Structures are given as C-alpha cells and as structure tokens.
C-alpha cells in the first residue's frame, strides 16, 4: 500500500502518516494539491493532508480543492499535537531570516518578536522544507521553524524549544481515499464525524438558517461552520460544516430536507477521528 503526504520527511504530515501507516510505503509530495492529484492519478492508495489548525484555522488549499475540483473524500481524521522548534545549523549564531510554512511562522511570531525583533520571515511550502533548506545552507545566518523530527532528519540543532504561541495547539489531518483505512492499532478512534459543503440557493430567504435548522431540530450537533468564496462573484459563498455522526439515519433525513430546500450538498468526508498522544494525554 502506498501513502502520499505533504513532505518532505520530517514534516508534521510525515509524522502523522508514519503513526497512521507504520508498515506502508510513504511518498512525499511538495504541495497539498500535488498529494491529492497523486491519488486522483492512482499513484497512491491514500493521501494525508492537513485540514485545520486550532490557532490559525482552516487550511484553505485542502478545503478549496476538495470542494471545487476533488472527487476524493476524507475517510479518517488524525488530531496531532503541534510543537514548534527553532532549528539552526549551529547554535548561538546570529539569525537574520527565519523560514517556515505560513502557519508555523504565525504560531512562532510572538517568540520571534520577543527574542529576534529584527528577523525577516520567509514562507516555504512546509516546515520540513524550511528545515532542509537551512541544512543545505550552513553558511547563511538563517533558521527554520519546524518539528523536532526535522532536526534529527536534517542534522540541525535546536536553538529554542516549543516556541509556539499557544501551548494548546493541535492540527487536524485528513486521510483521503476511497475506503476506510486500516489505521495503526496504536491509535484509537474517539468519535465519528461528517464534513459537508453546502451551497445555498440565491432565491431562498433565510437559506442558511433553514439549512442549519435541518440539523438542529433533529439534535445533530455541529462542531464547525465556515464560509468560503464560491469564486463565481463577490459575496457568493459555500459553507463548510462538521457534524457529529451519532445518528446516521437522522442525518439521511436531514440530507433529504436540504435537497427539498434547494440546498446543494457535497460530502467532503465521513470518518472516524483518531488522536495522537501528547505527553500521555489524548487530545481531540
């Protein structure tokens, strides 16, 4: 079995793929879109991509591709504790530029302002790419914000540990595929969820309220709602909602009511949620 992930080695996504599929062959891709397209081209059996961070919010590249272009769905979710490290080729040298993924830069911004107020920040496709770039340029006064695994992967030193702005920092990762995967027995499911994209009719007054009411009066709990541009005209949106899948039969009736209201529904995923332990504590 082949599993694709947002690479390179040492990225958070690589660690999630390793925890979830410890015995499978894993293939790194440069961008989230590349990972999903690899699945669509039948190069891999499952794709592992980030979908939401508890601090920075949704990963729009993932959600927008799945809504606008993708036919693939989420078949499992893994929640991973995020710890960011400041990595260098040699400790205690001046740092002029810090490289990382945009969300990692945002998570480490407060630390950088406090300890390196004049440092420049440059974006990369992933935290691990930043670590690899720093390792490949040992003569430059640069650093990377990346996971601890990237330090050992690329031979870097930890200049500062756990620099994330908020300690309670987690990222949801989706495993995309055609069927429910055989997740490692070291991970246990904690709940079941469904993710939907709703497109509202323009001629239905109170369309969003009526759409959400189909779940509310059936006692189906929402855990998230978010709007994204339809990319058709200014002010036109679709809505992403996450639901607890505790009553599948009721959910089917809700789908029927949405259809009767003229609300288009696209299932982005139906999946079990797994957690990776952080210092012995399971986190959702």
Feature map (PLM): residue ranges:
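Domain-level signature for soluble enzymes in the chorismate/prephenate branch of the shikimate pathway
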Residues: 1-284
């Amino acid at each position: 079995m082949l599993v694709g992930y947002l690479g390179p080695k040492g990225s958070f996504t690589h660690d999630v793929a390793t925890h979830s599929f410890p015995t499978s062959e894993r293939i790194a891709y440069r961008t989230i879109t590349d990972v999903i397209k690899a699945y669509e081209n039948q190069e891999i059996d499952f794709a592992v991509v980030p979908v939401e961070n508890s601090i920075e919010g949704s990963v729009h590249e993932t959600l927008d591709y799945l809504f606008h272009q993708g036919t693939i769905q989420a078949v499992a979710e893994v929640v991973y504790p995020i710890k960011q490290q400041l990595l260098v080729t040699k400790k205690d040298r001046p740092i002029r530029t810090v490289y990382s993924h945009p969300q990692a830069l945002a998570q480490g911004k407060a630390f950088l302002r406090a300890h390196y107020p004049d440092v420049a920040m440059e974006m990369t496709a992933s935290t691990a790419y930043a670590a690899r770039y720093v390792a490949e340029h040992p003569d430059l006064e640069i650093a990377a914000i990346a996971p601890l695994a990237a330090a050992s992967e690329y031979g870097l030193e930890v200049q500062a540990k756990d620099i994330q702005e908020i300690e309670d920092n987690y990222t949801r990762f989706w495993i995309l595929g055609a069927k429910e995967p055989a997740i490692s027995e070291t991970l246990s499911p904690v709940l079941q969820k469904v993710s939907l994209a709703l497109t509202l009719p323009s001629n239905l007054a109170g369309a969003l309220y009526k759409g959400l009411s189909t779940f509310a009066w059936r006692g189906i709990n929402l855990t998230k709602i978010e709007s994204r541009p339809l990319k058709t005209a200014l002010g036109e949106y679709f809505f992403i909602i996450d639901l607890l899948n505790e009553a599948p039969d009721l959910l089917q009736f809700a789908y029927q009511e949405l259809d009767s209201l003229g609300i288009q529904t696209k299932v982005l995923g139906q999946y079990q949620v797994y957690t990776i332990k952080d210092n012995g504590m399971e986190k959702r």
